[in-house]
Amino acid sequence: AGKHRQPSGNKSTHNPTYADPVIGTVSHIGDRGDGYVVVDAHGEEIRCHVPRTLPGEVVEFAVETSNSEARIANAKLIRVIEPSPERVQAACRHFEFCGGCQLQHAAPTAIAEFKTERVRRALIQQDLPTDVLAPAITAWGDNDPAQHGRRRMEFAIQHHGQDIKLGLHQPGSNRLIDIAECPVAASAIEDALPDLRELAALALKAGEQADCHVTATNNGLDIVLTRKREPGLDERLDLPEFLERKGWPRLSWRSSHRAPPETVTAFTTPTITIAGHQAPMPAAGFIQATSAGQDALIDAVMRIVTATGENAYCHDLFCGLGTFTLPLLAQDRNRKVSACDMAGDSLTALRQAAVDYGSRLMVEPRDLFRNPFYADELKGTDCVIFDPPRAGAEAQAEALADSTVQTVIAVSCNPVTFARDARLLIEGGYHMTSVQPVDQFQWSVETELVAAFTR
């Protein structure tokens, strides 16, 4: 499922003022990763978001005064008076300011519990059963250095004459935090931070800014620059030499995050590995954040599909590069899979990766938000898997609710939209038999999950 960081230049300047410090106890962690503390203000309760705090901690903090009538307020942490036993030392020097991570102060057990509870809250909000919810699986890849770290990142870059800034924005602000390290990123990306600054010096003029999308692939870093100005002749002459020197396979440019990337220079096609298959990587294409997370999601999906029996005919909706299509085809030599997505470049890559499967794979470009698969199109289908972006798959869930498909598997990166879609399936006669959270976003509030529904 896709995650999109707000592009640089679209953030507002926020210079809050604060009331006098108060002391309170953190009740729980909210969906943003902030601790919740309730304070009394002239007889009214105000719920305060206090960053970098944990449940049970006694903390001193100051509440923003920008909206004195609000019953929910942001706050800044002053000090932790009584720390939680789950509190740990942050791994990164930039944690207090950078917008990339929210939970570096929490032990892995506390993060897993938070992500499980985040899914539980979403289910409760839709009056859905929680007895089928399993504890979150942590899939950061710590036990395998080759799997550790996020293999896709997007940094903001700014050229200030002699000074190049590269990093992430402070939460709710247009202030760019210039980073010297990023332990959440794959080592191939973190080690290349000086090289990315060198790229910025070549690609940007003084006063310019851009976003730099970086994907760690099997054969080097795949780079996409997002900026308004099209690359000039000098850049098109200089950048290939730079890329060749760094051993990076491709550099692309786009004018906005919605525009298709244009290749500036490419020495080879970047690839990623999915269940043993080498899949060509579209520029700025979507892949799961970590290879360990990808494997955990595949394992969860394949266990459910296996229970449907041999030769099951499957639809893989929002299939992308084939995260589930490829292992589905590999697992059962008699299985047929219909794969669908609106991203044509991803479908092209999937066809290339699955060339050995011949007619067992059917690929269809389709906008599933406007044109979902309806019940009559799903006759004879044994299993449907859908893995939509954060917005969820409301239209497709409504259509599935009217179908006779025996098994539906929902993969989601947003517990709230998942719970909404799950309610539609249950109202249509499905039983939710399992919900498995998967934590592949180390130190972030983002939560993946895999859920099974049967008739």
Question: Over which residues does each language-model region extend?
Answer:
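Terminal RNA-binding accessory module
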Residues: 1-94, 173, 315
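Short, conserved phosphate/pyrophosphate- and ester-handling motifs at nucleotide-, phospho-/glycolipid
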Residues: 56, 185, 290
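Extended interfacial segments that mediate partner engagement and assembly in macromolecular machines
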Residues: 78-90, 96-205, 209
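Short, solvent-exposed loop/turn elements at beta->coil junctions and helix N-caps
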Residues: 136-145, 211-213, 256-260, 436-440
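Nucleotide donor/acceptor-binding cores
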Residues: 151, 221, 311-312
